[in-house]
Amino acid sequence: MSSRYTSSYTPSSRYGSGWDYSSSYSSSRTSRDRDTGSYRDRDYSSTSYTSTRPRYSTYASKYSTDLGKSTDKGMDDYSAAPIAKDEIEELSYDAKTPTTPTEETVDAPREVLQESQISDFVEEDDDQQTEVEEVKLTLASEPEESEEEEDDEDVRKAQELLAASTQIRESSPVSSPVKEVSSAASLFANDNGNETENRTPSPTVLNAKKLGGIPWPPKSSDVKKEGGDAEALPKKRVSDLIARFNTGVVEESKKTDDAYKNEYGAGTNVGKVSTHNFA
């Protein structure tokens, strides 16, 4: 094997170098062949191994022929397999033909009627027919009267509804239309008396009926009457105070020790309880 490769790579002058590729390649191949020779010389086809493991061809010849069909009778015949009892019962039930139910006719016993019984039977039949005819006549006459009464009731109800609707549409005497629309300012001036001080709408008193229709807010005259004779206090305007502060006028020398009480509304009646206001 090494000689074949060495012959093809002998001319080393073709590659332009002194290195001989053929010699190195052949030496490597010979060493590899030498190593693998030991494995190649081993004998795997021993008699003991072949006897325990038969070849595949023996199995193929046993279960198949040239056409590829199975030759085993037990595997080919599926009917030979055991079947459970319930399966056998199902198969036998399916094999039966459906049967139609037979109807048994039983003849009723015939009774022999005598002449007296026949006459009684016929008379009863005639009485029943006459009663039915009478009932039909009475039933036919009643619906006509009831229909007329229902029509009268419907007409009466319709007339009542029309009368009620016309009464609703007419102007009721309780609610009269508003003739004049008064402004808020005029209403507040009438209630309060001083239009410039209070321009807010007067709140409605919830229990005004219980209190006798008390107007709210109360007028200044009513407050004075309830409060009694109040002491006339001197009024200080803010403009006067500002003017005095700007000019720097000081009148402390003219004032007495009790002057500040009268100036800021603290008179001789401060701290005293007037009992005439209490009931």
From Swiss-Prot:
Q: Which residues form the signal peptide?
A: none
Q: Compositional bias of type Low complexity: which residue ranges?
A: 1-29, 45-59, 170-186
Bias (Polar residues) occurs at: 189-205
Where in the sequence does UniProt note compositional bias of the Basic and acidic residues kind?
30-44, 221-233
Question: What ranges does the record give for the region Disordered, renumbered to this chain?
Answer: 1-111, 137-233
Of the GO CC terms on this record, one is: striated muscle dense body
Q: At the top level of its lineage, which domain of life is listed? A: Eukaryota
| Acidic residues: compositionally biased ranges | 142-153
Indicate what this protein is called per its UniProt record: Uncharacterized protein F15G9.1
